[in-house]
């Protein structure tokens, strides 16, 4: 028997992709497909060991509290996690030594590598800005991926003892310089025809570096999600970022 998996948000586009990926995996067993009107108790009744959550920021915290209290580990792709929410998840996990929660801003391996490479490059360049581009139905802006990328860049700059990046702007239309995430400008584009894309632009004297990532289809998330499902038993507690499961 394989790992027993429940999918929350199973009727959504990403959820349907994850359901198909689990069904195609010999070492996983899909035991629950939970939609917005379904009772979470189905997870317990069907013996789910791990859930995958691609729901909404409004629903995810209640889902996590239920899963943790019932000893079910969770792989979470839902966005909207700030420091306060992460601290709440840690509090729920206290004393739950056999429960793991993986929260990742992006499960596409190319996006994870973009975040890692950006953090590595940050100390070599005076300036850095992040541009994320998504379909117009995305509920949050900027994306969790862009925020996580900018936070990593800012942390690397701080560790290297770098000053604030140069910007002589004195007058600007509101929002034209993007949102500041720990001092790194982040710009969000919402456009028909897009799925999920990110560009990180670095600059210093006489040269620039652009790291670009594109997800053209929601299937790009499935391999990373399955890495999380298969390995979460070895990672009790809260882990933020799939890179920690990939040895990066």
Swiss-Prot record:
Keyword NADP assigned: yes
Pathway the protein takes part in: Amino-acid biosynthesis; L-lysine biosynthesis via DAP pathway; (S)-tetrahydrodipicolinate from L-aspartate: step 4/4
GO terms assigned for molecular function: 4-hydroxy-tetrahydrodipicolinate reductase; NAD binding; NADP binding; oxidoreductase activity, acting on CH or CH2 groups, NAD or NADP as acceptor
Pfam family, one: DapB_N
Catalytic reaction(s) noted: (S)-2,3,4,5-tetrahydrodipicolinate + NAD(+) + H2O = (2S,4S)-4-hydroxy-2,3,4,5-tetrahydrodipicolinate + NADH + H(+); (S)-2,3,4,5-tetrahydrodipicolinate + NADP(+) + H2O = (2S,4S)-4-hydroxy-2,3,4,5-tetrahydrodipicolinate + NADPH + H(+)
List of residues binding NAD(+): 9-14, 77-79, 104-107
Record's GO cellular component terms: cytosol
Subcellular localization, as worded in the UniProt entry: Cytoplasm
InterPro entries the record matches: DapB_C, DapB_N, DapB_N_CS, DHDPR_bac, NAD(P)-bd_dom_sf
Highest rank taxon of the organism: Bacteria
GO biological process, one term: diaminopimelate biosynthetic process
Catalytic residues of the enzyme: 134 (proton donor/acceptor), 138 (proton donor)
Key words of the record: Amino-acid biosynthesis, Cytoplasm, Diaminopimelate biosynthesis, Lysine biosynthesis, NAD, NADP, Oxidoreductase
Catalytic activity, EC: 1.17.1.8
Protein residues bound to (S)-2,3,4,5-tetrahydrodipicolinate: 135, 144-145
Main location: cytoplasm
Transmembrane segments: none
SUPFAM superfamilies: Glyceraldehyde-3-phosphate dehydrogenase-like, C-terminal domain, NAD(P)-binding Rossmann-fold domains
EC primary class: oxidoreductase
Family label: Belongs to the DapB family.
Main function: Catalyzes the conversion of 4-hydroxy-tetrahydrodipicolinate (HTPA) to tetrahydrodipicolinate.
HAMAP family listed in its UniProt record: DapB
Protein name: 4-hydroxy-tetrahydrodipicolinate reductase
Species of provenance: Corynebacterium glutamicum (strain R)
Gene field: dapB
